[in-house]
Swiss-Prot record:
Major location category of this protein: secreted
Position of the signal peptide: 1-21
The protein, known as: Probable exopolygalacturonase C
GO biological process: cell wall organization; pectin catabolic process
Highest classification ranks of the organism: Eukaryota, Fungi, Dikarya, Ascomycota, Pezizomycotina
Organism: Aspergillus oryzae (strain ATCC 42149 / RIB 40)
UniProt record similarity statement: Belongs to the glycosyl hydrolase 28 family.
Length: 437
């Protein structure tokens, strides 16, 4: 399913209420006494020097304005890491270079991120008009340049690193990000009414994560993410994260925790996550946890609730033996795991993709997402792969109403979620027909 009309996006956004803060309030605009308008060359030159100049001169207590309907060429990376109490009014449209070789040269020289924004109380405000406020990255050409059985060409930039606190991000819009849309780090951040459109008309858009999140008190709501990787990926150390009233799809990899434990020496620490009232369309995954064999740490108190899925291959998926088709790992302790505790999956409804399961990210045989799964039927409502009989504790499922498109009974794959540690699991942990207890 492809996003082809901005009117459709506008309709979806207009159907949800405005979101409020995530626990902190950004500073009053009255304290931002300086208004700085970014001038545009109107397409005749590179506007990066002007943008960098304005960010440098107006780094504190300012409103930085990209004018509505105006185009800006951002042909060089922008780095503004000393911001404080700044509102970025993104009412224009930013255009990245369409010269793939030029961008790869910049990335290979050591600059991996196109926009780097850091500082407390850095707000981003786009316009309600869905035709403006876009960052246009022209990723389609990059995706189409990927060779057969490749997983994305080298030299792809991350679009944005956004590190802040006590901030709001409203009406952020990203069109065809090349890869890795936004790395969002910090505390007390509210994101609302964002659009990330990484749907492809050709080759698969590898690594087009929408939001990679790390921090405390972060809320993402009322947004649309169509992409070829995680809509949200929560990393360590993260606490009190909310993802609600969103629509995600295309060939999304869903609402994910991790991956965790790739570095066996790092202790993963994640608590209090809630994913609620989310629609998932044509995705590979809906709710997903992924950690590597040999990892260590604890993820505790996680809920996915009121999740509607349409044509999703794996609606509920847990693996403590995550596999990356581009990475080889040897010498890890196979009995070590990132521990999972107090996980709830509640009120799931909709259809399991039985007819055309999987997605375009398959570059190996077997596909990375099928590796290690016995006798897949693509009727599975749940896949629960615990690494040991002690690594999953207090798992709960309630009101799981998922049906395969072939209209057979839903099935389950479950490994080592023991009844002793999971008395309210809601079904028998075995491989076969899914039957609620």
């Amino acid at each position: 399913m492809l996003i082809t009309k901005t009117a459709f996006l506008a309709f979806l956004l207009s159907s949800v209420p405005l979101a409020h803060g995530a626990g902190g309030n950004s500073s009053s605009p009255d304290a931002r006494g300086r208004r700085c308008v970014v001038r545009s060359s109107n397409g005749t030159a590179d506007d990066s020097p002007e943008v960098s100049r304005v960010f440098a001169q107006c780094a504190t207590n300012s409103v930085i304005v990209f004018q509505e309907g105006v185009d800006y060429n951002i042909f060089q990376p922008i780095k503004a890491t000393n911001l404080s109490n700044v509102e970025i009014q993104m009412h224009g449209n930013l255009h990245l270079p369409q010269n793939i070789s030029a961008v790869r040269d910049i990335v290979n020289a050591g600059t991996s991120t196109w926009f780097t924004l850091e500082g407390p109380r850095v707000d981003w405000t786009g316009p309600e008009d869905v035709n403006n406020g876009w960052i246009k990255s022209y990723g389609q050409a990059w995706w189409d340049a990927n060779p057969p059985n490749g997983t994305g060409i080298s030299g792809r930039p991350h679009l944005m690193s956004y590190k802040t606190s006590q901030a709001t991000i409203k009406y952020f819009r990203s069109g065809k990000p090349i890869a890795w849309n936004m790395k969002l780090h910090g505390e007390d951040i509210a994101v609302s009414h964002a659009i990330v459109d990484a749907s492809s008309t050709g080759s698969f858009p590898f690594n087009t994560d929408a939001f990679d999140v790390q921090g405390t008190n972060i809320r993402i709501s009322d947004s649309i993410m169509y992409n070829g990787d995680d809509a949200i990926a929560v990393g360590s150390d993260s606490h009190n994260i909310v993802f609600e009233r969103n629509t995600i799809g295309y060939q999304s990899h869903g609402m994910s925790i991790g991956s965790l434990g790739k570095d066996a020496s790092a202790f993963a620490n994640i608590t209090n996550l809630r994913f609620e009232d989310v629609t998932v369309i044509d995705a590979l995954y809906a709710a997903r946890f992924k950690s590597w064999t040999g990892g260590q740490g604890l993820v505790k108190n996680v809920t996915w609730k009121n999740i509607r899925v349409y044509n999703v291959t794996f609606p509920i998926f847990v693996t403590q033996s995550y596999y990356d088709q581009s990475v080889s790992r040897d010498g890890v302790d196979t009995e070590s795991s990132v521990m999972m505790e107090d996980f709830t999956w509640e009120d799931f409804s909709g259809s399991i993709n039985s007819y055309q399961p999987g997605d375009g990210s398959c570059a190996t045989d077997p596909c990375w997402y099928n590796a290690g799964l016995p006798n897949l039927k693509h009727t599975e409502a749940l896949v629960i792969e615990c690494n040991t009989d002690k690594s999953c504790k207090n798992f709960v499922t309630k009101n799981i109403q998922l049906y395969p498109q072939v209209l057979e009974p839903a099935s389950v794959i479950c490994m080592k979620a023991t009844a002793e540690l999971n008395p309210n699991l809601g079904f028998n942990c075995s491989n076969g027909t899914f039957t609620s207890a």
